[in-house]
Design a protein with these regions (language model features):
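Short, well-ordered turn and helix-capping elements at secondary-structure junctions
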Residues: 31, 35, 61-63, 80
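Exposed loop/turn and edge beta-strand positions of beta-sandwich/beta-sheet ligand-binding modules
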Residues: 72
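Basic amphipathic alpha-helical segments that dock to polyanions
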Residues: 44-51
Length: 107
C-alpha cells in the first residue's frame, strides 16, 4: 500500500476532479474552493514534484500560448499507480470512519 499524506491525498483528488492535463492554477483553485484553505503555489508544486518522483502523477509541458506570454505550462495527470494509491487511501479512510458519526454528535 502506498502511503499518502493528507495534502497529497487532497491534491490527487483535485486531479481526479479536474481531469487529465490540468495545471497548477486550476489545482490550487479547486483545493481552495473545496477545503476553504489558502494554498500556496509552492506547496502545490513541491507536492506534485514529490508525487511525480513516486510515480503517482505524470507531467508534460504543454504548448506555448500568447496568453502566457509564449511560456509553456506544465500539465499533470494521475497515473495508474496514483489511482491505486488513491483507492487504497479512500478505502482506509472509509474503513476508519465507519460507524463514528454518532460519536461526533454534540450532546
Amino acid at each position: 500500500m502506498i502511503r499518502l499524506g493528507a495534502f497529497e491525498h487532497l491534491l490527487l483528488l483535485a486531479l481526479v476532479r479536474l481531469g487529465d492535463d490540468t495545471y497548477g492554477v486550476p489545482i490550487r483553485d479547486e483545493l481552495e474552493a473545496r477545503t476553504g484553505r489558502l494554498v500556496s503555489p509552492g506547496a502545490i508544486y513541491t507536492a506534485l514534484d514529490r508525487l511525480e518522483q513516486r510515480g503517482l502523477v505524470r507531467s508534460q509541458l504543454g504548448e506555448p500560448t500568447p496568453a502566457r506570454g509564449g511560456k509553456r505550462k506544465r500539465c499533470y495527470r494521475l497515473t495508474a499507480k496514483g489511482s491505486a494509491a488513491l483507492r487504497d487511501a479512500h478505502g482506509a479512510i472509509a474503513h476508519m470512519t465507519q460507524g463514528i458519526k454518532p460519536k461526533l454528535q454534540t450532546p
